[in-house]
Amino acid sequence: SVQDAMNLLNVDDFHLVHDTPDNNRDLDAKPLHSLIEIIESSSPVSLEKIEPTMVAIPTIFSHHQDHVHVHNACIAALRPISTPVSDIVLSYEAPEHSRWSATGIFEPNFFVEIDDVIDQKIQAFSKYKSQIRPGGRDADSIRNQAKYRGQEVGKNLCEAFYVHRFIL
């Protein structure tokens, strides 16, 4: 379950906007302004409530329409006129994003070495059973993607991101 994965990753609080198995099928039909409001202020873990320094969001290059919708809502909620402004905003990649997209190709410009946490990442993902499937959403695909991204930057295993904002 999501709760099991969050526990394994020591995530102390989270909010599922759609918390039943069928709800993610219509997330992209939810008005964008209502998702923006959830992200900005109404969620228990909203930007206003937790004031995160770093936020990672789905990439626009996902072939999942609900992920693209959430990406667009996040970009609007994280605009630089928001209060507070998160210093670091990144789009993350999932293994299947490099295989099929109608909107473009994920081109990362920020890499994080994950040698020490790859097993924990795979174990956490394995708790989210409804999301496991061959061809991008399985342990081998996660490890292979990390190897590929690591090779791009001369490291062993890396996770790749696209930087939207990075303020030091």
Question: Where are the language model's segments positioned?
Answer:
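The feature marks non-catalytic terminal segments
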Residues: 1-13, 26-30, 85-168
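Active-site beta-strand->loop->alpha-helix modules in alpha/beta enzyme cores, enriched
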Residues: 1-85, 153-156
